[in-house]
Each structure stands twice: as C-alpha cells, then as structure tokens.
Design a protein with these regions (language model features):
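Residues forming the flavin
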Residues: 1-225
C-alpha cells in the first residue's frame, strides 16, 4: 500500500488503477449497479441504482470482493451528530470540501487515524488528540511521527466512554475517555474532554461478507472471496 513496486501500481491512486484494469473496452463492467440477490441455479440478480432496472447474470464461478465496513465501538450517545467514521470524514473533506467539525478527537491510532488526522489538520481543523485502547500505537511509525510533528498527542491505553451532547442536545460538544485494560474502562480514571465538535472514528474494518456467505450456499466451492 505504501511501499509497493511501481510495476504493481504502487505509484498510482486507486481510481487510476481501476481505469487501467478496466481498459478501453468496458463491456461487462456495470457501473452504478449492486448485487440485489444470489439465486438458485447460480444466477446473480443485479439492480441498477440509477433507473431501478433489475437484470440477471448466470455464471459458473463467483468472486466476491465487497470490501469492508467500518467498526463502530459502543459508547454512550454514539448517534449524535458529530460522531462519524473516517470514511464519512474523508469523503466530506476531500470530495465536498466540507469540514464536519473544527475541534476533533480521533479514535484509533492506526494508519487511517493518522492519515485522517493529518488531512484534517491540513484542512484547518484542530485535532486535539488521537486515542487508542491498546497499550501501544498501531500503524506505520512514519505515519505516527508525521502527526506527532504537528503537535497532535497520541494517547494509548485510552477508551471512549461517551460523546457529550451540547446543551441543546443537537450535536457533540465533548467526550469522556478513561484508561483501558483489555478494552474495558478502568473505574475512577474517567476524564472529560471539552470543546470537541467532531469525533472521528478510526477503529478498524470488518469484512463485508454477507454476499460471500450467500454465494457459498449457492455456488459451494465455486465461490471465492
């Protein structure tokens, strides 16, 4: 990802790699479409998200590459406006040129936590801290050093307990964190962080394997993930 040989597209962005692999003849590549269901008889039901059309594709083998979905740790008031996953923060910042908050707490000291915190700082936000429940930092040291040089503290062994609502209850205004022992809060170590309007969740990813499970029911050993 960071150090691939150029022959393996290590010098290119993801959208550039997709264009290269698709080539000029894009027959058989269906954009703006999603797999609606996997049916008996090795048939894939596909829905066009733009016009609502549903069509069917029959095949002998199936490869599922559905990616992953963000993990959202459980904490009080996790549904408040101002609590977002890194994917949402990045999309709004990079594509919509919109900061979802100016005073940020990042949850998760891994490469994504470092990267989004760095980008947020470049965009003008104040990243107050990056917290990590594990006792040690994750990710590449070069990424951690990059945010540390910006003066962003990385606090290990800390867990998020609560997103504190604003007085009108309409958004985040702070957070309660505590020392962590095996992902459990240590009683009596709670600390209130004030002046936060964005909690940036970078707690990792889980495989999006629902289609893979369904595919293996229909295709058996001819379904790959």
């Amino acid at each position: 990802f960071f150090f691939e040989d150029e022959k393996r597209y290590g010098d290119r962005r993801g959208f550039e790699i997709a264009s290269l692999l698709a080539g000029d003849d894009q027959e058989g590549i269906f954009q703006n479409c999603t797999v609606w269901d996997i049916l008996a008889g090795k048939t894939i039901a596909v829905k066009n998200l733009r016009n609502g059309e549903i069509f069917y594709i029959s095949c002998d083998k199936l490869v599922v590459a559905a990616g992953a979905i963000p993990l959202l740790p459980v904490f009080a008031n996790d549904d408040l406006p101002g609590v977002y996953t890194a994917a949402v923060v990045q999309k709004m910042m990079n594509r919509e040129l919109t900061l979802l908050g100016k005073h940020v707490l990042t949850v998760g000291a891994g490469n994504i936590g470092y990267l989004t915190s760095y980008q947020l700082r470049q965009a003008g936000a104040n990243v107050k801290a990056i917290i990590e429940a594990l006792p040690a930092e994750g990710g590449f040291p070069v990424q951690a050093d990059r945010v540390r040089r910006l003066g962003i503290p990385i606090l290990t062994g800390k867990i998020l307990l609560e997103a504190v609502p604003s007085p009108d209850g309409k958004r985040v205004s702070g957070a309660v964190i505590a020392d962590a022992d095996n992902f459990q809060p240590v009683p009596g170590t709670e600390k209130l962080l004030t002046g936060i309007d964005l909690i940036n969740i970078c707690a990792g990813l889980a495989p999006d394997n629902k289609l893979l499970r369904k595919g293996r029911e229909i295709f058996g050993v001819d379904c790959y993930g």
